[in-house]
Amino acid sequence: MKKGIHNYSEIGKLNRVLLHRPGRELEALTPATMERLLFDDVPYLKEAQKEHDQFAKVLKDNGVEVIYYEKETAKALKETAVREEFVSNMIELSFIESEGMKQAIRSFLMSLEPEKMVEEIISGVRRDDLGEVKTGSLSDLAQSDYPFVMDPMPNLYFTRDPGACIGDGINIHHMHTPARRRESLLLKYMFEHDPDFATEGNKQFYDIYDDYSVEGGDVLVLSKDMVAIGYLSLIHI
């Protein structure tokens, strides 16, 4: 694998692609959670995985190196201090008010190995995972029937959205909807700490914590000298 980011065309030869294989996060979609998680239908997991595997095979058969969010993010989280910072940022972007709940989630996630931690974050942290947690938050009590304390990421298989590779650099996008914003954090840590991406020469043009929303489908690399930016409902500038 050639290290770093090198993308100077939307239509040139594709050498490497970052994917997410649909997983347990799709099983979190129910009539009660669909709207909150931005779905209007419940996909069938086995069929989604079958279609994904066929797509990935076509890419591999044509010489494309396929890499996956879970493994690359886990590689970025090998150091304990990096994992601690990552978990704190994930909790912050989950809008959890109760300090007791924050600590319970932190303890649960930090007890896991990096790859398992990433899997659980993508699949969603359930109340049942934490056992009994004492909280004084009215908002938490109001949502006590909701199964998740940290929502799953069922939209992650739209891997183009959280970021855009531009030349030898990257945008880490501030996603428009709170339901998707944490997806960009996976990419941010991958870019900053995964040895296959965190090269000295790489540049970052936009960050998840910047003020305005941008999503990947709105950014097109036309040539080494030109980028087109769409101005649509999900992009605020």
Could you describe each region identified by the protein language model?
Residues 1-235:
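The feature marks the mature, well-folded catalytic cores of soluble enzymes
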